[in-house]
Amino acid sequence: MTPSAASALVEKTPLETYVPPAKPSLIGLSRAQLCDRLGDVGVAPPQRKMRAQQLWHWMYVRGARDFSEMTNVSKEMRATLAEHFTVDRPEVVAEQISADGTRKWLLRLPSGGDGQKAHEVECVYIPETDRGTLCVSSQVGCTLNCAFCHTGTQRLVRNLTAGEIVGQVMVARDRLGDWIDRETPNGNRLITNIVMMGMGEPLYNFDAVRDALLIVSDNEGIGISRRRITLSTSGVVPNIKRTGDEIGVMLAISLHAVRDELRDELVPLNRKYPLKELLQACRDYPGASNARRITFEYVMLKGVNDSLDDARKLVQLLKGIPAKINLIPFNPWPGSNYECSDWDQIEKFSEYVFNAGYSSPVRTPRGRDILAACGQLKSETEKLSVRERNALRAMAMTD
């Protein structure tokens, strides 16, 4: 298989760096950083920790959107905070609701300083009978060029800040009424799980992703357990161990091939970090056990990686790793060179892997009709034409 021009590059370079606005948001700051910002506006050292805890509670427990809501903070302090800061999160530009209940939000990030353009990202809420999962983005665009992924065709504009990542969770909670003492207008369904599987490669934005997930998992705030947060990477090997040590969330690997020559084409990052290095990093992942298995994501591509020989090789590769295998039917998008494997072939592949002792669920495609399924996200900064959108919807309806 000859690599396409689009996938020839292993990584893309960001077109921009983030420039903070003149009045920055406090969303995404650690407690220590909040104390520093309070010091910047004249709060005395003995009061900073207490004030920071008040802000933390209002932002992450009650979802305050304005300092005026913070009724146990003095009027003078609220005025000072409002003069210098905001608690803004991204703006909802559009909301789409799939026939299966999946929701996709197009979010406009606050524009930065020096006239920096406001950019857009997407996040997706997936309701299920026993959980509600939010798929969160880490970059505007993506560093990588995975051949089967729509997001990978987009430019990498810039990394998101910790505040912009946390802000996606807060927007979803706003829309779902998922804050304490709030009405729940959308069926009383709560966000119980977070997956870092939206736009971008999280481990190429490690510091911001780490800081955001530590806030999201803080039990005095949003409080989503680290065991209910999954970070998916295409294999940035040097940061895999750091993920376990510094964040402690569940790990997922976008594997998709069992031979280096094929993975070089599907996931060009493999040329930098080949399978042997990637799988060793998984064996060494801190905290991995039968109770905390690593998920290996495997998109099923017709005639490419879906043979029983591929299944046998997959089982061999994962020997010694506490693992489960998530088989993903390929989600079509206009211009893609791939097709989804036939369902009977997916079932045979799954059965072989299951009989070898690995959990191998087939992911149910969700939100295809609104371009919200795995591999379909692409922000409005890289708009689809009407023809492309109609073509994609037609493909979704024929599955």
UniProtKB/Swiss-Prot annotation:
Q: What else is known?
A: Reaction proceeds by a ping-pong mechanism involving intermediate methylation of a conserved cysteine residue.
Q: Name one GO molecular function term.
A: 4 iron, 4 sulfur cluster binding
Q: Where in the cell is it found?
A: Cytoplasm
Its keywords, alphabetically, are: 4Fe-4S, Cytoplasm, Disulfide bond, Iron, Iron-sulfur, Metal-binding, Methyltransferase, rRNA processing, S-adenosyl-L-methionine, Transferase, tRNA processing
Question: What is this protein's record name?
Answer: Dual-specificity RNA methyltransferase RlmN
Q: Name one GO cellular component term.
A: cytoplasm
The family database entries (SUPFAM superfamilies) matched by this protein are listed as: Radical SAM enzymes
Q: Which PANTHER family match?
A: 23S RRNA METHYLTRANSFERASE (PTHR30544), RADICAL SAM CORE DOMAIN-CONTAINING PROTEIN (PTHR30544:SF5)
InterPro entries registered for this protein in UniProt:
Aldolase_TIM, Elp3/MiaA/NifB-like_rSAM, Methyltransferase_A, RlmN_N, RNA_MTrfase_RlmN, rRNA_lsu_MTrfase_RlmN/Cfr, rSAM
Name the GO terms of the biological process aspect. Answer: rRNA base methylation; tRNA methylation
Q: How is the cofactor bound?
A: Binds 1 [4Fe-4S] cluster. The cluster is coordinated with 3 cysteines and an exchangeable S-adenosyl-L-methionine.
Gene name of the record: rlmN
For activity, the cofactor(s) needed are:
[4Fe-4S] cluster
The residues responsible for catalysis, as annotated, are 122, 374
What biological function has been recorded for the protein in this entry?
Answer: Specifically methylates position 2 of adenine 2503 in 23S rRNA and position 2 of adenine 37 in tRNAs. m2A2503 modification seems to play a crucial role in the proofreading step occurring at the peptidyl transferase center and thus would serve to optimize ribosomal fidelity.
Q: Where does the record place the Radical SAM core domain?
A: 128-371
The protein's matches in Pfam families, at most eight in alphabetical order, are given as: Radical_SAM, RlmN_N
Q: Does the keyword S-adenosyl-L-methionine apply?
A: yes
List all disulphide bridges recorded for this chain. Answer: 135-374
On whether Transmembrane helix is a keyword of this UniProt record, the answer is no
Q: What is its EC number?
A: 2.1.1.192
Source organism per UniProt: Rhodopseudomonas palustris (strain TIE-1)
Residues binding [4Fe-4S] cluster, per UniProt: 142, 146, 149
UniProt record similarity statement: Belongs to the radical SAM superfamily. RlmN family.
